[in-house]
Amino acid sequence: MIAPSPKSSEEEGQKDEEVLQGEQGDFNDNDTEPENLGHRPLLMDSEDEEEEEKRSSDSDYEQAKAKYSDMSPVYRDKSGSGPTQDINTILLTSAQLSSDVGVETPKQEFDIFGAVPFFAVCAQQPQQEKNEKSLPQHRFPATGLQQEEFDVFTKAPFSKKVNVQECHAVGPETHPKSIDIFDFTPFQPFLTSTSKSESNEDLFGLVPFEEIMGSQQQKVKQRSLQKLSSRQRRTKQDMSKSNGKRHHGTPTSKKKTLKPTYRTPERARRHKKVGRRVSQTSNEFVTISDSKENIGAAVTDGNDRGNVLQLEESLLDPFGAKPFHPPDLSWHPLHQGLNDIRADHNTVLPKQPRQNSLHGSFHSADVLTMDDFGAMPFTELVVQSITLQQSQQSQPVELDPFGAAPFPSKQ
């Protein structure tokens, strides 16, 4: 992109001339190059800028080298070398110099940019101070003071306030008042000082849980002992007050109020229904045992009523309840059409054989054996019906093996 020449700008308007003159700036119009009278191409500009940057970087490098030449003998020996100095040569020269002087460890190493490593600012001061006696003094003019001023970025010194004596503590010998590079005391000395305190606090200033719980348990024990002693005093006072009047206590005495209140309704129930209840704990069976009179009222015969009541009393289970009686089959709606034998028995007594139109009527309750629920086994029903019906009927009847209603056989 080449800017237009002043010849072409004369042909255009006056405004364009002003703009172009402002763009051209202070460049020389008497350039000998015919193609670009007003400007140079962009590629040439970039090359010139690169050369200027190289010069500026070289000057910066020389300044940094001049600064570090006071500290390190490496740069004093290699002051004539250019910016393309190799790292290996620096390390080799430093190792050679240290071996010549008789020092075991090499001096501070500088990276490509001429900066000191971050960890080497304060840690290597003790070694250098030991080596200052063996090395000539004119090579190290005030090394300790200058090393404090230089950090990684060769600007704001972090460790300005650190004394040379305190910087020894970063090495193997550490004492509780040592300060690190950032002017802070290490975390460990505070821990050792606080852990020896009486309260045994942890890192965060908190007392351990066991100590708190132990103190609380001791307090609880003391309180319980105090309560026990107060109770013993009360009982002794009560005994001394009620001495001699023990058996006839007035209704305002304390012993009646101390009794629990939940026992009184149970006692009242026990005194009211003591004749009718067998069990003291079950309240459900009171109504069942109270309904004895209702069962007996259904019986019409006066003589049978006494027998039935005696049977019921003897057959009560341990809970005071009677055996379960299923509803009579003759009263069931399914068997309403089979009521031909119901005329013999008007009422059904409990614990007596049930009227059954299928198997006939059973007259004696002693012959039949009932189970716990007032029902008879199937085999006994069949056998008893056969024997009873044979005694009633004059002619012999053949019965089917399944105990069905006896029909006269067709002989």
From Swiss-Prot:
The gene is BMP2KL. InterPro entries: AP2_assoc_SerThr_kinase, BMP2K_C. It comes from Homo sapiens (Human). This is Putative BMP-2-inducible kinase-like protein. Residues 47-71 form a coiled coil. Residues 8-18, 53-68 have a biased composition (Basic and acidic residues). Residues 220-234, 243-258 have a biased composition (Basic residues). Keywords: Coiled coil. The keyword Coiled coil applies. Residues 1-87, 215-280, 392-411 are annotated as: Disordered. Pfam families: BMP2K_C.
